[in-house]
Amino acid sequence: MTPTLTPPLQWQRRHVLSLQDFTVAELDIVLQTALSFQEVLNRRTKKVPTLQARVVANLFFESSTRTRNSFELAAKRLSADILNFSPGTSALNKGETILDTAKTLWAMGAEFMVIRHRQSGVPHTIAAEMDRLGGQVAVLNAGDGLHEHPSQALLDLFTLCQLYDPRQPRCALLQGKKIVIVGDIRHSRVARSNLYSLKTAGADVHLAGPPTLLPPEFADYGATLHWTLEPALADADIVMTLRLQRERMDQYLIPSLREYHQHFGMTHERLRLCRPDVRVLHPGPVNRGVELSSALLDDPQFSLVNQQVSSGVAVRMALLYLMGTYHGVKP
């Protein structure tokens, strides 16, 4: 059994490329649909025929473990046929362009393209080309450069809303909640997508990080900026830490990983500054002892990291299903 969308909840997006212009109603549709698929995943038979005989192509031009496997499992749970593209063994090595690769997969019958690339805008370019071809292909951005990572932010949103109401997750639950995002904001596509979704949901978003990783222009997103961690954590409801890419140390953006943890790493001691019922998120992979202490990461009283991973499959099933309804998939 798959969700049935009533007329007020009809999905109107062919592609999911950015969360910048998502409405509260659209976010709530994703949350409600993900809840339905979470119920499917909790059954003995964890599969529905929703996308049976439909072709989902995973084009990951950048390495990934969690996101790629999560999308692949989501497509399998929907009974889709899956094409996994591997750039290392593809015609890209022979000079083929990315657009030509996408058009080749379209010609083979791909109806959904899940795309990750290190350059910002690649999924948008492919989506525009698919629209030009009139092929009814749905494109989902699985992370593009420093731009966005919509499905990660949506699974974070689902995880948070379920924290406050497991049976009816909705954006209104985050109204006025103080959510602190800590780390390398400058280079984080996860931070950007979360900023869009959390602000739309009505959360009070704060950003914390060293000045080299948190430029002042991020105030334009409607967030409060902090260049020291302790003031940001005061009475926080949620703390979301971001992975620190080790190459930032090579670029002299931070003195050392040890010093970063000393000033911006989350520990049980720092959680005392937050509300007693605070919870901690991280998109993964985690650098233990850098963004989070191992003790905090493994503490189920505070850490929602495993719940985020579990939520990811249901949310990505929801996105593929919803995009499919735009293209004629029947509930």
UniProtKB/Swiss-Prot annotation:
Recite the UniProt keywords alphabetically: Pyrimidine biosynthesis, Transferase
Query: What's an example GO BP annotation here?
Result: 'de novo' pyrimidine nucleobase biosynthetic process
Return the broad EC class: transferase
Residues the record lists as binding carbamoyl phosphate: R66, T67, R116, H149, Q152, G284, P285
Molecular-function annotations in GO = amino acid binding; aspartate carbamoyltransferase activity
The protein's role, per its UniProt record: Catalyzes the condensation of carbamoyl phosphate and aspartate to form carbamoyl aspartate and inorganic phosphate, the committed step in the de novo pyrimidine nucleotide biosynthesis pathway.
| Record text on subunit structure and interactions | Heterododecamer (2C3:3R2) of six catalytic PyrB chains organized as two trimers (C3), and six regulatory PyrI chains organized as three dimers (R2).
| Protein name in UniProt | Aspartate carbamoyltransferase catalytic subunit
Write down the species: Thermosynechococcus vestitus (strain NIES-2133 / IAM M-273 / BP-1)
Q: What gene name is given for the protein in this entry?
A: pyrB
